[in-house]
Curated annotation (Swiss-Prot):
GO terms for biological process: defense response to fungus; killing of cells of another organism. Transmembrane segments: none annotated. Belongs to the DEFL family. Residues 1-23 form the signal peptide. One of its GO terms (cellular component) is extracellular region. It is found in: Secreted. Disulfide bonds join 30-53, 39-65, 43-67. InterPro entries: Scorpion_toxin-like_sf. This is Putative defensin-like protein 280. It comes from Arabidopsis thaliana (Mouse-ear cress).
């Protein structure tokens, strides 16, 4: 019984870890020549529901275009 509980606990933890970073897809660097409207348009062209510009998670000084998957 304890092994079944441990299995489900590990399964849930692994599922959360694997899916937490899949919501957004990094697409392009945002700069004055590629703004939020361009980001949204390009993401929609590639089949995503939309896109937005935000600071990069690794290098916050760089603004990146992220395409949403939901």
């Amino acid at each position: 019984m304890a092994s079944i509980k441990h299995f489900f606990l590990v399964f849930i933890c692994v599922s959360v870890l694997l899916t937490s970073g899949l919501a957004d897809y990094k697409f392009h660097v945002c700069d004055p020549s590629f703004d939020e409207k361009d980001c949204d348009f390009e993401c929609k062209e590639f089949g995503h529901p939309g896109g937005y510009c935000r600071p990069d998670r690794v290098q916050p000084r760089i603004r990146m275009c992220y395409c949403t998957d939901r």
